[in-house]
Design a protein with these regions (language model features):
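PLP-dependent aspartate aminotransferase-fold enzymes
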Residues: 98-195, 199, 212
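Structural signature of PLP-dependent enzymes
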Residues: 302-327
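Active-site PLP attachment segment
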Residues: 249-280, 291-298
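Active-site-adjacent loop/helix segments that line or gate small-molecule/cofactor pockets in enzymes
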Residues: 2-42
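Active-site core of PLP-dependent enzymes with the aminotransferase class I/II
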Residues: 198-224
Length: 425
């Protein structure tokens, strides 16, 4: 099937000359099928357009930040109004106070907020705040869990030395015995325990937090004086209008936020409860653009939509429609899918596909039919997605299943993925 990508190919060639690897970080397409565009030219609602003019129904939502739909009218109006007044100033804007008030009013465990730019900023702020509270060193982190790209947590080890992680102790997510063992290993020096909102790692099925595990984490932190830190950067406000762990009835001491809170404008946050306010005050954290006003205005408008609109119910509804439709399609072509996690944050794998050749081929065939899915990362549904969008998506994925069935006898293992997975073991 013809799929124009001349402009994207030219951009890749130019990028390779001036950007290491042609692109870096989580938005590099190096591990995706070759037809995937590296660059995009514009977006609106649920749609993306690449430089060659190809249009996609986007199920990655900028890897999470697009919650309400690209270019949401209310959010864009708030951002534009603030831009006319000023963005990055000599001091923070007055709306920073309004934003903090709004945020803590929505999150039940929170009494204060600090703002930054990216999820890594927020999780790293949480770590130093936890250490400052009782002057302890050890941080407990679930193994093979993504909390950002700082030296203490980046999944790639190039440029990282052992000292960067000397005070990190690992445990298995949702495993009470493993968590208790990690506490014992740390003795009386546990500063904090990081836990993802739910398990949402690449190349893995997703798991929601088990109530027994979540309550044990809370109990162990209470008994030891350690801080319980929920990383809600990816899942925040996509599962609940509160911290995601509110779904299991557990309140953390700190929570890290990002992605959706300004519907794509660059801002993240650390939220905390009253007892840890003084520790947060004592740490020195800052950045040249952390106090920019335009993202804060966008965040206020976004949080207002989160509080008052039916965005969450809309995402859940269309997510379930898509999930049910894909199950039916897969079965019709003799395939079985594992669809895990919340329907509005779907992770999809094929059964009996250990080297990912089926998933990669299916995603490639969907892409050239105008649907942007991801072969190994969890996906995201935004509130702008309609039932008609789902219908069009299923039309494309149905054709993709048919194409996969024809191509399956000649498919080869995805070598670049298998090499990466071998390194992760």
């Amino acid at each position: 099937m013809a799929w124009p990508n001349k402009r994207n190919s030219e951009l890749r060639e130019r990028a390779n000359k001036v950007i290491p690897g042609g692109m870096y970080g989580h938005q590099s397409t190096a591990l995706l099928p070759d037809v995937y565009p590296q660059f995009f030219s514009r977006a609106h609602g649920t749609r993306l357009w690449d430089p060659d003019g190809n249009e996609y129904i986007d199920y990655m939502c900028a890897y999470g930040p697009n919650l309400l739909g690209y270019g949401h009218e209310t959010v864009e109006a708030a951002a534009a109004a603030q831009q006319r007044l000023g963005d990055t100033l000599t001091g923070p804007p007055e709306i920073m106070v309004t934003l903090a008030e709004k945020f803590v009013s929505l999150v039940s465990h929170a009494d204060w907020a600090m703002f930054c730019k990216n999820g890594t900023d927020a999780t790293s702020m949480a770590m130093v705040t936890a250490r400052a509270y009782l002057d302890r060193k050890k941080i407990l982190v679930a193994s093979k869990t993504y909390h950002g790209s700082a030296p203490w947590c980046t999944p790639r080890t190039a440029g990282i030395v052992a000292e960067d992680r000397a005070q990190i102790i690992y445990y298995e997510y949702n495993n009470p015995e493993s968590l208790e063992s990690a506490f014992r290993s740390a003795g009386d020096d546990v500063a904090g325990v990081f836990a993802s909102a739910f398990r949402h790692e690449v190349f893995e099925d997703q798991w929601m937090p088990d109530p027994e595990f979540a309550n044990l984490a809370r109990k162990l932190c209470d008994n030891s004086g350690a801080l319980l830190i929920v990383d809600d950067v990816r899942a925040g406000f996509r599962v609940a209008r509160d911290c995601t762990w509110s779904k299991v009835g557990v309140k953390p001491d700190l929570s890290a936020w990002g992605k959706v809170i300004a519907n794509g404008y660059p801002i993240s946050a650390l939220l905390g409860s009253e007892r840890f306010r003084e520790a947060a005050r004592r740490v020195f954290v800052t950045g040249s653009f952390w106090f920019s006003a335009v993202p804060m205005a966008a965040a206020i408008a976004t949080l207002d939509q989160i509080e008052k609109s039916g965005y969450l119910e809309q995402m859940e509804k269309t997510g379930r429609l898509l999930r049910d439709g894909l199950h039916q399609q897969a079965a019709a072509y003799g395939y079985s899918l594992r669809q895990t996690g919340p329907a509005q944050m779907p992770q999809i794998f094929f059964e009996d596909d250990p080297d990912y050749r089926l998933k990669y081929c299916w995603c490639e065939e969907a892409l050239v039919r105008g649907v942007y899915l991801h072969p190994y990362h969890n996906m995201f549904i935004c509130a702008a997605l309609t039932e008609e969008d789902v219908r069009l998506t299923l039309e494309a994925t149905g054709e993709a299943f048919a194409a996969l069935k024809k191509r399956q006898p000649t498919l080869e293992p995805v070598e670049k993925v298998n090499m990466l997975l071998a390194q992760r073991k």
